[in-house]
Design a protein with these regions (language model features):
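Short, structural beta-strand-to-alpha-helix junction motif
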Residues: 16, 37-50, 61, 111
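Mobile active-site "lid"/loop adjacent to the S-adenosyl-L-methionine
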Residues: 241-273
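Conserved SAM/SAH cofactor-binding pocket of Class I
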Residues: 141-250
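Conserved AdoMet
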Residues: 2, 70-149
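Flexible, glycine-/basic-rich loop-and-beta segments that form/coincide
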Residues: 336-346
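Conserved Class I SAM-dependent methyltransferase catalytic core
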Residues: 268-334
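N-terminal mitochondrial targeting presequence
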Residues: 1-38
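Residue-level signal for inorganic ion chemistry
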Residues: 69, 109, 139, 173, ...
């Protein structure tokens, strides 16, 4: 499986490839593609040529990169699903040109997802386009958390559950939830017009456009316009920008060059958008409605303390670990406020 890790684990300093290899392409405008073959070559030969060229130029995951691109051009998801006979056949001139064109994009450090313009998220195949944030495996785990809770606590049969996603990107979270829960209806907020358009396109391709309403709104800048738009929401879910600003300079070029920086940078402590979500959430959620956040492993303790000090209507329920054992997900719940009502002195 091609490793699409969260931005936190894709810092250049943590890559296993030598730093001088990683950054070689950054010292010049472009890396040159290998010479176009004079004669015909097979898919296996093309795989070998591009794997070696990616290695020589410090492209991360060189073998997987060439395999996914060439499998895509052969109409398959993975190279393992392509028949060996097909791999041993000569490529047509047009196919070879396509291999060189797409692999040259990867050579520029464009993520494979953007090169082939699609990617699988759980059981969905979604269109991908820069600069819209690419969903990571950790976010699939976030969806599983939400699904488990909604399936175990479906709520009233008379009132279908509703979900609000803040920062929907490609639509991966909302669309995955809608596909798994036929009774669910979803709303999404997204500041980027590129992401709004891509979410709507993915919803239409999956036949889910009638159950997902995407608003082109910034949760911080457009906060005053939001009251009344949403109420009695069962679940609020978000994979918000949560990187510490100081970490932005050390991101891999796949991220820093091609993905929307605003979808990554969470401010000095990574909590700018998260604090805003938690401030607004009580106005949107039904009583005992829940919030599910994907966060930096340094965040859960900070979020717990901040909520206790600033948002009386929310209770921090628990922190969940991701598959790597890192504290990655925060679950909170709206509770009835116990604050005494103000007494009119007149």
């Amino acid at each position: 499986m091609f490793n699409v890790s969260s931005p936190c684990v894709m810092l250049a300093s943590s890559c296993s490839v030598k730093n001088e290899q990683i950054w070689r392409c950054l010292t010049r405008p472009t890396c040159s593609a290998p010479a176009f073959p004079a004669g015909r070559i097979t898919a296996l030969q093309a795989l070998d040529v591009w794997k070696r060229h990616f290695v020589e130029n410090g492209v991360t995951e060189p073998e997987q990169s060439s395999q996914y691109i060439i499998a895509h051009l052969l109409g398959a998801k993975t190279i393992e699903s392509v028949e060996q006979q097909r791999l041993a056949e000569f490529l047509s001139k047009e196919e070879t040109q396509q291999v060189w064109r797409l692999c040259s994009k990867r050579l520029s450090r464009m993520p494979v997802q953007f090169v082939i313009e699609e990617w699988d998220f759980r059981d969905l195949t979604l269109k991908m386009r820069p600069p819209v944030f690419i969903p990571r495996p950790e976010t699939e785990e976030l969806v599983e958390l939400v699904l488990t809770d909604l399936q175990n606590h479906p709520g009233s049969t008379e009132t279908p559950p509703t979900c609000l996603e803040v920062g929907c990107g490609s639509g991966a979270i909302s669309l995955s939830l809608l596909k798994s829960l036929p009774q669910l209806e979803a709303f999404a907020l997204e500041r980027s017009q590129d992401a709004v358009d891509l979410s709507r396109e993915n919803a239409s391709r999956l036949g889910l456009q009638d159950r997902l309403k995407v608003y082109h709104m910034d949760v911080i800048k457009d906060a005053e316009q939001m009251p009344g738009l949403f109420s009695s929401i069962s679940v609020l879910v978000s994979n918000p920008p949560y990187l510490f600003s100081e970490d932005m300079a050390t991101l891999e070029p796949e991220i820093s060059r091609f993905e929307d920086r605003a979808a990554l940078d969470g401010g000095e402590d990574g909590l700018n958008v998260i604090r805003q979500i938690l401030t607004l959430a009580p106005d949107f959620l039904s009583n005992r409605g829940r919030i599910y956040l994907e966060v930096d492993p340094r965040h859960p303790a900070l979020i717990r303390r901040w909520v206790e000090d600033n948002v009386e209507e929310l209770r921090f329920v628990e922190t969940r670990q991701d598959v790597s054992g890192k504290p990655r997900f925060c679950i909170l719940q709206k509770e009835e406020s116990h604050k005494a009502p103000e007494v009119d002195q007149d």
